[in-house]
Amino acid sequence: VSLSDTDNSTESEDRTVPQKEYTDLELLHELEPVVEENTHRHLGVFKEWNPHDYIPWSEGKNYKALGGQDWDPEQCKLSELAKVAMITNLLTEDNLPAYHREIAMNFTMDGPWGTWVNRWTAEEQRHSIAIRDYLVVTRSVDPVELEKLRVEQMTRGFSPGQNRQGGDHMFADSLFDSVAYVSFQELATRVSHRNTGVACAEPIAQELLKHISNDENLHMIFYRNMVEAGLEIAPNQAVKSIHKVLDNFTMPGYTIPGFRRNAVTIATGGVYDPQSHLAEVVQPVLRKWRIFERDDINGEGEWYREDLHRIITGLKKTASDFEEVKTKYLERQARRAERMAAKV
């Protein structure tokens, strides 16, 4: 038997050896240096910005309670698509207290982990402050209705798997579940904010949402790096969580009143649709992790990795089917607009 044959045999055996099953406490300890390193990296590249710099305050005026005029639909300068997308993004950001609780419970508030959780929360809070100020000052939405939606959304909270929210398998039962979910979710949110800015067709809104989307991208990189490090420590456990998250993925704003209807408007308008979810979120992250190239996944982990192909195939079909439906919908809308114009 040649030396190369022996080496190949040993390598093959290594790939079938059961891997250590880490507890969340052990993973928190193993990943702590990575968290500290990436927090420092994040702070080094983060560009400070202030919400008040991107609000056209000169357009503002008192509402009726202070002797001014209450909101009127004619005051809105945004398209229906931009308005729906802005409201959905804002209400999603409004649930930050619930997200903070989920992250803090699945991570820890001790040491570098706690430093990151609090920094992430502080940066995220800017987003709702800025978007709300913009919408209220420019009178782009009904502020009374917006406040009612905020209260209802926050009362519902964000507790996947509890209070009949989203089913038992939708979100995080473990540390890996949590970091895998936010790796995809933060990137999805970045895409949504960026495209909402374009849909607004208004320079100040576009600049504001560019800053917010940049924040989300940096958050995604942090969490993506956590999963990447986790794949080196416990590849089978990590790929199992990645599979779970992708097989049950939904955006965190799913508790928003009218979310399904708004999601259709947002998708049809090209802000965030099945194709962008696949091509701009799922596939780039999986490529970065080299999921299908790794040679350290075996046993149960290999089954979950192979089944990712089924999930991706399903996402491709969903994207293709949606494009067909979207085309027919837009054609109907165009014909309706022509008929309305002919009556004028």
Residue ranges and their predicted role:
Residues 2-344:
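Non-heme di-metal
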